[in-house]
Amino acid sequence: MTIQFLKNVKKQSYKGLFLTALACGVVPLQSCENTTTEQKNDVAVQEKPVRAHSITKGRAITNVKDVFKCDVPGWRVTAEGTLVGDDGREWVVPAKSSYQTGLKATDLFNECTGVLLENEDGLAVDEVPIIEIDSDGEVVTGYFFGDNYFEFFVNGKLVTVDPIPYWPFNTSAIRFKAKRPFVMGVKMIDWSENLGLGSELMRGVPFHTGDGGFVAIFKDKGGSVISSTDSSWRVQPYYISPLLDPSCVQADRTSKSCTVPPKSDAESAYGVHWDVPENWGLENFDDGAWQNATLYTNEDIGGSIQRPAYQNFTGLFDNPAHDAEFIWSENLLQDNLVLARKIIE
């Protein structure tokens, strides 16, 4: 069921129309099946159905102006904000993050810290911290490049966070110790300047819809590749914006057909949000409703991979023997918070 039926409902105010539709969860993300009833005066009263999703409209209130600052060309204001959905829930945009408290991954290329390795061979791997998940596990080294920000988990435990949440682009690594089978999880965030509107200033365009993208490769202690980002990863979006009309989002959260608001109405963009499950990083989490990751070429990702933060490490990520693929959900432009997971047997 989609919210398209709203167009066929007449003689209602916009507000009434909107709330009537949402009462049945018809932004097709959830039907009216999840309802409860209670007996009042011998009459069964149907309560308001419980919806998983929430819809927001317009720009967020900025709560944290400077999540990260860096005095180099290309740095962008990195802020966090909040806005309230149609159901009264408050949402952090672009997403709740552990940037302030999480362990920063070890730099391979970071203009803000001055670490500018020419290739991965310059990394002293033995000096990279090992985060222990299992005392009797194997040591794995992960190498990451995200557009824009990532948080990396193993068996639901936060292992490390991207040292730079927005711009400039960077490459990093971490080591962890885990026993198979273990679950690798990644929270991928496409940061934005226009909080709540899912857009940024780009080449003079004030409401440019930026893209995401994430690539990683994992090696054992001997240097052999045990995994890399590919289509076997399972992904699911949890924040979609900017949307001209939230009805475009399908029940499986597909948003490929969604259009972006025109520049003249960009401040009125909609967003659709879902709560992140607490157990999404655990082995027993059911990701059956998730999608397989969509693969993107270097050209799809665009300008970010033209920078030395990526180009210096093509021998690592684009090795023909073990080519790591850029992954995201089906909508590279409007899906701003995407979770990804992979079980290593």
Explain the meaning of each model-derived region.
Residues 1-12:
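N-terminal secretory signal peptides that target proteins for export/translocation
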